[in-house]
Amino acid sequence: MVTEQEIEAIGKTLVDPKQPLQARFRALFTLRGLGGPDAISWISRGFEDSSALLKHELAYCLGQMRDARAIPVLADVLQDTSQEPMVRHEAGEALGAIGNPEVLGLLKQYSTDPVVEVAETCQLAVGRLEWLQQHPGEATCAGPYLSVDPAPPAAEQDVGRLREALLDEARPLFERYRAMFALRNVGGKEAALALAEGLQCGSALFRHEVGYVLGQLQHEAAVPGLAATLARTTESPMVRHECAEALGAIARPACLAALREHIEDPEQVVRESCEVALDMYEYESSQDFQYADGLERLRPPP
């Protein structure tokens, strides 16, 4: 049983800017796993932070918790134009992930936002909520991954056909996202290489999602594409950061070299992502039981 004091101690680590970013991330994922109103309250307090990376991750976790009590804070973040685009985007995506149709009006309103990543995110979230309404009771988390995705995977299993749908920029973004998650679920080298081709597509939002999905897939065939995208200084920081985190999750020696190369990147979100990714690399390469170890750090060993 987790005590109120323990949740408070983990929450204080999360919101303390003096703590190393890695410790704050581990605290965040611990709170996400614990869930409930106190965890939501602590996570919500972090949106004043100076790190866009941390704030975007706060929004991501609130969406993955799928608790309607997080809707008000996420709606505020989406509407707050002083927040960085990647933070607002993640808040919009999180509102779609929670799956409550009451936010449809708000998401439709921001589907024409002047910030293209925010507009596209809200369009996808509207697509997801409308899909849920048309397919009640149908599992959206089917497959080997537990994440709540911005679009349900396509039923198609053929990698060639899915690749074609993924890379066809004339198709609706929602349809291409469905192909993306289907490729991830199929898995294997061919699917990883098809996804990596998506890192060349036109939409920065799309490219960043490809980076995220390749991190979930953890296939080393994607490492060259991810490393090249991370190294491309003209690329959107939102995309580069996702590629860095994917390299941390894949955790092969070639990933380590790419991450170390950008640990002092002039772009804050890229620099911080490499820090967090190196911590993730360490975890993936270790025998540690879990990454979200906020409770273990509080409790003395038996």
Curated annotation (Swiss-Prot):
InterPro entries: ARM-like (IPR011989), ARM-type_fold (IPR016024), Deoxyhypusine_hydroxylase (IPR027517), PBS_lyase_HEAT (IPR004155). HEAT-like PBS-type repeats lie at residues 54-80, 87-113, 175-201, 206-232, 239-265. It is an enzyme of class 1 (oxidoreductase). Pathway: Protein modification; eIF5A hypusination. It catalyses: [eIF5A protein]-deoxyhypusine + AH2 + O2 = [eIF5A protein]-hypusine + A + H2O. One of its GO terms (molecular function) is iron ion binding. Transmembrane segments: none annotated. Binds 2 Fe(2+) ions per subunit. Its cofactor is Fe(2+). One of its GO terms (cellular component) is cytosol. SUPFAM superfamilies: ARM repeat (SSF48371). Keywords: Acetylation, Hypusine biosynthesis, Iron, Metal-binding, Monooxygenase, Oxidoreductase, Repeat. The modification N-acetylmethionine is found at residue 1. Fe cation 2 binds at residues 89-90, 208. Belongs to the deoxyhypusine hydroxylase family. PANTHER family: DEOXYHYPUSINE HYDROXYLASE, PBS LYASE HEAT-LIKE PROTEIN. Catalyzes the hydroxylation of the N(6)-(4-aminobutyl)-L-lysine intermediate produced by deoxyhypusine synthase/DHPS on a critical lysine of the eukaryotic translation initiation factor 5A/eIF-5A. This is the second step of the post-translational modification of that lysine into an unusual amino acid residue named hypusine. Hypusination is unique to mature eIF-5A factor and is essential for its function. This is Deoxyhypusine hydroxylase. It comes from Mus musculus. The gene is Dohh.
